[in-house]
Amino acid sequence: VKIVTDPEVDLRKCVVGVACAAQAIKDGYDVDVFFAANGVKMLNDEFIQSLNSSGMLPDGMIFDLMKTITQQATSVYCSTGSQAANGVTKENAAEKLLAGYDDWMTWSGPPGVISLSANSDVQLIY
């Protein structure tokens, strides 16, 4: 599952992508999730906290979805360049990303996207 849409432009699309990834994981599929472009905002702790507080989703729902992905996906990748464009680097990630990111997230870029795409049977892009 690739999450590339800016949640500030089309939040519903991002949430649907995250929900589909979480459901596929719960259904027993091997799921790799790659956050790129402005979709990397979905890994930003402040953004997720704000989204939960906004009332646009049931309270705690986004935390549950992201917990499923971060704890049970086969792998979670983020675009290093996209994160940098949003002010997140490896040096300041601990202050900005979801807790425990260094345990479940792999910094990557186009080679990772290509490899995952070439090795996947199904791709969902949001």
Regions found by a protein language model. Give the residues of each.
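N-terminal beta-loop-helix "entrance" segment that forms/cooperates
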Residues: 39-52
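Short internal beta-strands
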Residues: 21, 31-37, 76-80
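Short, glycine-rich nucleotide/cofactor-binding loops
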Residues: 1-15, 47
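Solvent-exposed loop/turn segments at secondary-structure junctions
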Residues: 7-8, 38-41, 82-86
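A glycine-rich helix N-cap at a beta->alpha junction
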Residues: 50-83
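Histidine-anchored nucleotide/phosphate-binding helix
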Residues: 13-27, 33
